[in-house]
UniProtKB/Swiss-Prot annotation:
Has three domains with a flexible linker between the domains II and III and assumes an 'L' shape. Domain III is highly mobile and contacts RuvB. Its main location: cytoplasm. Belongs to the RuvA family. InterPro entries: DNA_helicase_Holl-junc_RuvA_I (IPR013849), NA-bd_OB-fold (IPR012340), RuvA (IPR000085), RuvA_2-like (IPR010994), RuvA_C (IPR011114), RuvA_C_sf (IPR036267). It is found in: Cytoplasm. This is Holliday junction branch migration complex subunit RuvA. One of its GO terms (biological process) is DNA recombination. GO terms for cellular component: cytoplasm; Holliday junction helicase complex; Holliday junction resolvase complex. SUPFAM superfamilies: DNA helicase RuvA subunit, C-terminal domain (SSF46929), Nucleic acid-binding proteins (SSF50249), RuvA domain 2-like (SSF47781). Residues 1-64 are annotated as: Domain I. The RuvA-RuvB-RuvC complex processes Holliday junction (HJ) DNA during genetic recombination and DNA repair, while the RuvA-RuvB complex plays an important role in the rescue of blocked DNA replication forks via replication fork reversal (RFR). RuvA specifically binds to HJ cruciform DNA, conferring on it an open structure. The RuvB hexamer acts as an ATP-dependent pump, pulling dsDNA into and through the RuvAB complex. HJ branch migration allows RuvC to scan DNA until it finds its consensus sequence, where it cleaves and resolves the cruciform DNA. GO terms for molecular function: ATP binding; four-way junction DNA binding; four-way junction helicase activity. Homotetramer. Forms an RuvA(8)-RuvB(12)-Holliday junction (HJ) complex. HJ DNA is sandwiched between 2 RuvA tetramers; dsDNA enters through RuvA and exits via RuvB. An RuvB hexamer assembles on each DNA strand where it exits the tetramer. Each RuvB hexamer is contacted by two RuvA subunits (via domain III) on 2 adjacent RuvB subunits; this complex drives branch migration. In the full resolvosome a probable DNA-RuvA(4)-RuvB(12)-RuvC(2) complex forms which resolves the HJ. The gene is ruvA.
Length: 205
């Protein structure tokens, strides 16, 4: 089982990278985000590896962080999500953005990934909503947001507020954190317009 590879980039393809490790070229399939962050041919690179062994093939998937690899594994625990769809989701959303989308029940953001229709997006949100908080690191903001949401807070106004703040130029994590703070500071039960105002107030501090 291969867990990690450190070597020199030989070539970067549309959906994979060939990593030269002591003269052996390993083909690792990666998300578009990972490929975009890799250096050029001839430069050093380190990839966390997920190894798939089938009767007729051995396939490697490469990630820049262990967290991204864990998300790849977790996504495939959802019915109807295979390696191709999991990589498509990770090509569209960072681990932090994906965690926020699940916490916010934001199916629209997840369905932006190629090959992810509304039904699959619903399953991802539904099946992972209780598993996602087990992760740490980049996902910490979304965990806090999920705790602020609780069971009695309507998801739609929260999702709309985060989307609006994102459209104003803030990153998704900034927007999610601002809305979480707004909920904590008296915004529970507020409509999207009020959450946007409170969120902007938090961002201006």
């Amino acid at each position: 089982m291969i867990g990690k590879l450190k070597g020199t980039i030989d070539e970067i393809g549309e959906d994979h990278v060939v990593l030269d490790v002591h003269g052996v070229g390993y083909v690792a399939h990666c998300s578009a985000r990972t490929l975009a962050k890799l250096g050029r041919a001839g430069e050093a690179a380190v990839l966390f590896i997920e190894t798939y062994v089938r009767e007729d093939q051995l396939k490697l998937f490469g990630f820049l962080s262990a967290l991204e690899r864990e998300w790849f594994r977790l996504l495939q625990s959802v019915q109807g999500v295979g390696s191709k769809v999991a990589l498509a989701v990770l090509s569209t959303l960072t681990p932090g953005e994906l965690a926020n989308a699940i916490a916010l029940q934001d199916k629209t953001s997840i369905s932006r990934a190629p090959g992810v229709g509304p039904k699959v997006a619903v399953r991802i949100v539904t099946e992972l909503k209780n598993k996602a908080p087990a992760f740490v690191g980049e996902m910490a903001p979304s965990i806090g947001l999920k705790q602020e949401l609780g069971e009695g807070v309507a998801a739609a106004p929260v999702s709309d507020a985060v989307s609006a703040l994102t459209n104003l130029g803030y990153s998704r994590d900034q927007a999610a954190n601002a809305v979480a703070a707004a909920l904590k500071n008296g915004g529970e039960g507020a409509d999207s317009a009020r959450l946007i105002r409170l969120g902007l107030k938090e961002l201006s501090r």
